[in-house]
């Protein structure tokens, strides 16, 4: 198993990163990708990845919430991080019109700039989209032929949105959202429609703790060690063997991110 989305730079992990990594290994994970969401956290993600070679890797980018910080120097500041072998994707980047912590115009400018950077450097993109599907697709589509790959992380969209993403060749990241018996039911119904070769699994830790995990953790903090539960639930709803799905999704991640 490989967790493609862990926010290990989040303050909730500030006191026990070694223990979190150890628990992930004990749970059977073979790696995790640490998400970068701004320049500072991307540098921190790279530092953490370098501390755990061949188990942790990083992304580097600017999340749409932080797009208001993007300026004429941002691409040049980001590029050295992206050229590190431990950084395997550009992102988290994309559009989030649900909250608009940055204006849509700021988000679109930062997104397009990062797509250009990914094309220039030759690394895949780690994507975010919330309530912005039409613009997201419109901005992304022209770049796809110049990118080595793309994953829409933490997918929670509709069947039409899923089909549109799959038609463009995107990988689909699925989280513990499928373990929420209230909000996750529509996503559960879509699981069988994601081809196995396009499916990736992630915790998005410390967020999105699977609601149905037993025994319930003392903390609401999600961790990579809970990825096996997500994989088993995904396999259940897809009516597939869990061990097979764990291996297939790891293979997918290694192919997309070009991991050894």
UniProtKB/Swiss-Prot annotation:
EC number annotated for this UniProt entry: 3.1.11.-, 3.1.13.-
Keywords: Cytoplasm, Exonuclease, Hydrolase, Magnesium, Metal-binding, Nuclease
GO terms under cellular component: cytoplasm
Predominant subcellular localization, coarse grouping: cytoplasm
Similarity section: Belongs to the metallo-dependent hydrolases superfamily. TatD-type hydrolase family. TatD subfamily.
UniProt cross-references to NCBIfam families, sorted A to Z: PRK10425.1
Designated name of the protein: 3'-5' ssDNA/RNA exonuclease TatD
Gene coding for it: tatD
